[in-house]
Amino acid sequence: MTGRIHSVETMGTVDGPGMRMVVFLQGCPMRCAYCHNPDTWNETSDDVKFMTVEELWDQYERNRQFYTNGGITVTGGEALMQIDFVTELFTYFRERNVHTCLDTSGICFDPHQEVAYRKLLSVTSLVILDIKEIDPDKHLWLTGKPLEPILGFARLTADVGIPIWVRHVVVPTITDNADHHYRLGFFLGSLKNLQAVDCLPYHVMGTAKYKELGIAYRLEGIPAATKDLAAKATRTVVEGIKAYRR
C-alpha cells in the first residue's frame, strides 16, 4: 500500500515526545482560516510523493539513532483521510517497537466506520488532537466543517484509553473567547485519557503561501497572538477541566 506524502521531516521536536520523524500526508477536507499548510489541502498535487510503508521505514532507519526517546508522527493535511495507510504504517512501526503518534483534527471520524478507527487506535501510542473551536457555529465558520465528528473522535480515544494531547490555537478576536475556552475545558474534563492541553498563539508566518497559491487569506489584518494571551486561554481551559471533575 502507498500513501500520498506531502513531505517528511526527519528531526521533528514539537510533534510528540522526543525527536521524531514527522510524515505530512497530502489532502485535508478542512479549510481552517489560519492553516499554515494550504499546500496540503488538495489530495493531488504536482509535488505529492507516493511512498510505501517500507520506504518510510528505510528513511526512519537511517536516522534511528536520534529517535531513542521519540518515534514517528503522522500529520497532514489530515492523516485520517488515509486511515488504511496510516493503520498499516503504524502496525509496521509498532511491531518494531517504535512509538507512534497521530496528529489529527478528527474531522473524518464516522461512527459507522468505528471498527476501522479502533483498529488504527490499537496501534497508536499517542493522539494529538487539534480542536479549533468548541462553539459549533464558530467552528463551521472557521474550518468549513462541523464540530461533532471531532468530539466523537475524542470520545472514542477516551473509550479506547489512548493518551491524548489537545491543542487549540488562540486567534485574537476569533478564538480568544473566555467562555468558549471554559466550555472547551469542560468538555475535555470528560476525557479520562487527557494528558496535556496546549493553547498556542496564532502566528502569521504562513500567509506567504496563500499569496503563492492565489488563495485569499481570510484573517488578513488580524495580528499574531501574544504568549500571554495563549497562557490566559490555557488557564481558562484548565478551570473548565477542573469544574467538570469536581
Kindly give the residue locations of the regions a language model identified.
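Auxiliary Fe-S-binding modules of radical SAM enzymes
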Residues: 2-17, 170-246
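Conserved AdoMet/S-adenosylmethionine-binding subsite of the radical SAM
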Residues: 57, 61-71, 76, 80-200, ...
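Canonical Radical SAM [4Fe-4S] cluster-binding loop centered on the CxxxCxxC motif
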Residues: 7-9, 13-51
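Short glycine-enriched, charge-decorated loop/helix-capping segments at active-site entrances
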Residues: 39-46, 140-146, 214-222
